[in-house]
Every structure is written in C-alpha cells, then in structure tokens.
Amino acid sequence: MDFILPELGEGIEEATVSFWMCEKGDKINKNDDVIEMLTDKATFNVPAPVSGVLKDILVKEGDIVKVGQKIAEIE
C-alpha cells in the first residue's frame, strides 16, 4: 500500500522530513506515529494509515514533501 503524506493543516502544502521513527522492515501498527514532519508553523507526527511492514522508505531526513506525495510503502 502506498503511504502518502496526508493533510497536515489548513494552508499547509508541504513539509520537511524531520526523522523517521522506524526503519525499513519494521512492523508498524495502524495509528502508530512513524514520521515527524516540520513546517514553518509546527511539527507534526504522522501516523501509519494501516498495520503492516514498512517495505520501503521513499523520502529521507531533510527532504521537502508535498501533501499527497508517496513517502513509503507498507506491505
């Protein structure tokens, strides 16, 4: 399943990856925080949309990601 960056708040179109709270191959549970994102207004923890294994991480720390962009794959 594609893990996309969800809406973070009104008017926020992109955010910077602060850090991943898990690694490729880790088992994750739905609603567990897995990535921290930074904007000019706030810091957001983004939860996993589903339970599974983090198959691939597509963005790294420091990358700027747009809302709706695929950031990882969950299997």
How should these model regions be labeled?
Residues M1-M37, N45-S51, K55-L58:
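Acidic, low-complexity mobile loops and tails
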Residues I57-I74:
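C-terminal structural segments of small proteins and small subunits
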Residues A42-F44, K70:
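Flexible, nucleotide-binding loop/lid elements of kinase catalytic cores
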